From Swiss-Prot:
A lipid is attached at residue 2 (N-myristoyl glycine). Residues 268-303 are annotated as: D1. InterPro entries: Polyoma_coat_VP2. Pfam families: Polyoma_coat2. The keyword DNA repair does not apply. Residues 329-340 have a biased composition (Polar residues). Residues 233-267, 312-356 are annotated as: Disordered. It comes from B-lymphotropic polyomavirus (LPV). This is Minor capsid protein VP2. Residues 308-354 are annotated as: DNA-binding. A motif (Nuclear localization signal) lies at residues 320-326. Residues 343-356 have a biased composition (Basic residues).
Amino acid sequence: MGGVLSLLFNISEIAAELSLSTGFTVDAILTGEAFAAVSTEAAWLIEIEAVDLAGLSTLEALSLTGLTTEQFSLLSAIPTALNNAIGIGVFFQTVSGASAVVAAGVTTFGYSKEVPVVNMALVPWFPQVDYLFPGFTSFSYYLNAVLDWGESLFHAVGREVWRHLMRQATLQIGQATRAVAVRSTNELSHTLAQIAENARWALTSGPVHIYSSVQDYYRYLPARNPIQLRQEYRNRGEPPPSRADFEYQENREGQRARRELGYDEPRSGQYVEHYTAPGGAHQRVTQDWMLPLILGLYGDITPTWEVELNKLEKEEDGPSKKKARRSMQKNMPYSRSRPQAPSKRRSRGARSKNRA
């Protein structure tokens, strides 16, 4: 086993010296990448016939790559010797397994990287700190929060203050708008009520004149002759009356017209007397016929209308359950004795009923 270790040590020294003379890295020499690169370059020179054109031999053409024959031989022999040494170490395993451990260590040895890994610009991987020190990430987070509390606290408090201000501003604007609308409505209602109370009201018969004019128009129309009356009765499918009936009907209509003309028509322009508060109290007063209007402007209702509304609400909601229960209790027969539950037992003792 000591010979294997000395062989590996010598191979490492030769690879280090060869790296200084050729410019290749130690890991490239041990893995065989340097030999593969030199072989590829020599094959390329032979392919383009540079050796034949120059009139040089193959060994002299190898010097064009910058390497000597000894260096080329060492580049090809070192990877093979390293693999053989590792195989010998695995073959001569001891009971304790020291040779296997040495072989594994030599196999890695920092030079067992693959070609893509060597050529690519990768970042070394480090395990998570929590694997080695559980809870360190949480501790670092809280430590960072404690160290940077000033800025975060300023932003958090500023954000909450801004949200509170916006919320309060929205509420204040809504309340102010609602208050202005309610105040404007109340002022308008109060103004209309004052106008209605202090206005000068007069009785007029304008609508009555309209209906009376229509009535006079139909009254003074020419009377229908007997032929028109008979035709009207025939259209309705009724037997026409006699001449005496016609005369009686005409006399009756004339008497009714004369009786209606004898009535006095209501005069227009009669003003309603406005009375002040009794006793000089200077309180607001209004006429009885104007009271529903004034109360409606202020949002109140008259007692009569309140009774009507209560009736309508009771009809919509239906009779209450309490009244229905009372009516059921009245209809049930009255009895003093209360029914006993079937689950009750008179004798709950452990002794038997036959105690004799």
